[in-house]
């Protein structure tokens, strides 16, 4: 039997105690071990015959295609998307430079290559005039007025702002429940500040689950990139620049506010 998540030795100690107390016999343990060894020995030949090489570039291209087909366009006011040639674009948001592309916890894997949206925008050949980047906010939610001021200053120089927001690895991970459905307060404050000086804001949202969107009226476009994998940023760039058309659909119902959800009356209670 495979036990997940890893028990950290608790189950081993329980088994040792059970053997000493006579509740479990060594023959019982041997029988379970034989089953595991049978699996190991019966699959060894197949593993040995498995291909030892693979095409990393082809895998990355497939990942980019899969991510692009999953991206959801939630809003596009005044046809602000796709971005247009000659348009002065400011990229703001920590997720543009350090992508949130996968879940946190035991699901995390080491990708051979990970796209960053900032690099993809800089390398784009659509004729967009990139005017600069600002992180805009602390990724883990701490207030940082200086970063926000830098972002607002940059937003004033652009025709359009691409604002990369989302849930960080500490707010959304295996082993914990989210305390709410909201974006971090510092991200919402940044959106307010940027929209106050430049109404042409495109929000690209990175998150593995729904977030409430009472702030959606303060951006002209809202694109849900989910957790797009190693090539998710490149796929997002393809969508934003019009190389590909967004065709993804939501797999969950999104509420504008937590008050709109049926769970509002129960969430946050004590016990079960």
What positions do the PLM features span?
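Catalytic center-proximal scaffold of phosphoryl-transfer enzymes
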Residues: 5
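C-terminal non-catalytic regions of proteins with extracellular/luminal or membrane-system context
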Residues: 8-24, 38, 53-57, 61-272
């Amino acid at each position: 039997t495979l036990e997940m998540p890893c028990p950290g030795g608790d189950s081993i100690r329980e088994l040792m105690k059970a053997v000493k107390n006579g509740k479990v016999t060594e023959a019982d343990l041997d029988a379970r071990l034989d089953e595991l060894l049978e699996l190991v020995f019966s699959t060894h030949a197949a593993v040995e015959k498995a291909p030892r090489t693979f095409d990393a570039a082809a895998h990355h291209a497939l990942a980019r295609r899969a991510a692009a087909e999953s991206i959801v366009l939630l809003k596009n006011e005044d046809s602000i998307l796709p971005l247009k040639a000659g348009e002065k674009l400011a990229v703001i948001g920590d997720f543009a430079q350090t992508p949130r592309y996968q879940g946190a916890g035991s699901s995390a894997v080491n990708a051979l290559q990970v796209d960053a949206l900032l690099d993809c925008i800089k390398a784009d050949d659509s004729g967009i005039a990139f005017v600069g980047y600002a992180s805009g906010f602390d990724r883990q939610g701490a207030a940082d007025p200086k970063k926000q001021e830098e972002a607002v200053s940059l937003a004033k120089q652009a025709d359009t702002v691409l604002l990369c927001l989302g849930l960080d690895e500490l707010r959304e991970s295996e082993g914990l429940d989210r305390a709410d459905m909201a974006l971090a307060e510092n991200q919402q404050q940044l959106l307010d500040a940027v929209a106050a000086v430049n109404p042409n804001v495109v929000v690209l949202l990175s998150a593995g689950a729904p977030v409430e969107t009472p702030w959606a009226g303060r951006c002209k476009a809202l694109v849900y990139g989910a957790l797009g994998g190693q090539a998710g940023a490149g796929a997002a760039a393809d969508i934003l620049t019009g190389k590909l058309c967004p065709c993804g659909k939501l797999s969950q119902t999104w509420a504008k506010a937590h008050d709109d959800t049926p769970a509002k009356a129960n969430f946050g209670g004590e016990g079960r």
